[in-house]
Each structure stands twice: as C-alpha cells, then as structure tokens.
C-alpha cells in the first residue's frame, strides 16, 4: 500500500479510516489514551488536506452483539477534545447507512461509526458487508497495524473495493519491523510484550533464528 501522505488530491474526498482504538475503559472512562495519541498525526494530516473522514474501529470483543459498555462514545469525545474538531458518533445500524446519511451538515468533517465488532459480518470478513462499507467512501486508509493480521471485513476484504493506503503510524510500525528483521547487528536480544500469547507463537518461532 502507498502511504496516505503521498496522496495530495484529498480535498472533499471521503476517507474511510480504519483505526485501532481498542482502549481500556473503566466505568466508561478511558484509562490509557496511548492508542488514540499515536493516530493523531494521521487525523491532523487528513484534516489539513480537507478530507471528509469516516472512522471505523472497535473496542473489546462484543461478538457481533451490541454491548453498550463497549461503545466508542468515550473515544469520540476524547478525539473531539484533542483535535478541537467535533467527532460525530453515528449509532445508526451501519447496514442501514448510506451516503446521504453522512456529512449532512456542512460543519461535519469527522464521523465515527459505532463499534464495528457489533456486527458479526466484521469478523466473518463478509464480502457484502465490506462492499457496503466501501460504498460510503472514496478511499481507504489502514491505520490499524496491530489488527492487520486479522481477516476481518474492515481490514482485509474492504481493500478489494477501494484504493487503499497506509497511515502515518502504520508506516512507522513497518519501518520498526524492518529494523528487527533485516537490519540486525549481533549480538542482540529480543523482548516481546503484550497479551494473547497464543496469537504470537508463530511470530516468536519466526524470530528465534534471528536473535541470540
């Protein structure tokens, strides 16, 4: 994918921006904004380019059901404060949304769709669901590096329907990965962190020969 910062003709284009805003919540309050802070440069770039931004993301594992405590509302509020731009959360059923529902008001610049994992079609990588999402925008930007191994509709299938780009933070992650896979100077050790160790077994096996 090309980097979005190489695309200059973005004014009034609808940009479907896939983010990983899977933040920790405690009684509806965000306890760690790191994931939000890291994607701010991409959002600010798109705002500067006068694009119309449609944010897609998830929180938790609602398994295709609406779970109110996993709403993206706290995230939309935090982004509104940090960007000094209203991030309008749309809670309407995504399958019922069409182009006419978005950017009705001239002041609407950033729209956030409700938790994409409220829809079972997302994790099934559903063709029709991805095609519908794509119909809402002109281009797609993947700024969810940590989710990009998943064959989900808003990450994998959607790129079949729209011109696709990588976000600024996505590119930084790729460059960091290149450094530990192709630019290693030995002796070197590797420290791996994170949860869900079962999803990292293959990565660890891949890295073992490269480190001491």
What does each of the following model-derived ranges do?
Residues 1-212:
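Active-site loop-to-helix "anion-binding N-cap" substructures in soluble metabolic enzymes
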């Amino acid at each position: 994918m090309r980097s979005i910062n190489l695309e200059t003709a973005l004014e009034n284009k609808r940009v479907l921006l896939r983010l990983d805003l899977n933040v920790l919540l405690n009684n509806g309050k965000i306890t760690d904004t790191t994931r939000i802070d890291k994607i701010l440069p991409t959002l600010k770039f798109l705002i500067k380019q006068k694009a119309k931004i449609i944010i897609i993301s998830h929180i938790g594992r609602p398994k295709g059901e609406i779970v109110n405590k996993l709403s993206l509302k706290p995230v939309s509020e935090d982004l509104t404060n940090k960007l000094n731009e209203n991030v309008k959360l749309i809670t309407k059923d995504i399958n019922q949304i069409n182009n006419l529902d978005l950017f009705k008001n001239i002041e609407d610049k950033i729209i956030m769709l409700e938790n994409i994992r409220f829809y079972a079609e997302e994790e099934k990588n559903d063709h029709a669901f991805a095609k519908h999402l794509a119909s809402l925008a002109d281009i797609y930007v993947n700024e969810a590096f940590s989710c990009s191994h998943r064959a989900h509709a808003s990450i994998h299938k959607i790129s079949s329907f729209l011109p696709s780009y990588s976000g600024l933070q996505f590119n930084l992650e790729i460059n960091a990965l290149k450094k530990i896979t192709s630019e290693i100077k030995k002796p070197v050790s590797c420290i791996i962190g994170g949860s869900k160790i079962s999803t990292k077994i293959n990565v660890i096996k891949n890295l073992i020969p490269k480190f001491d």
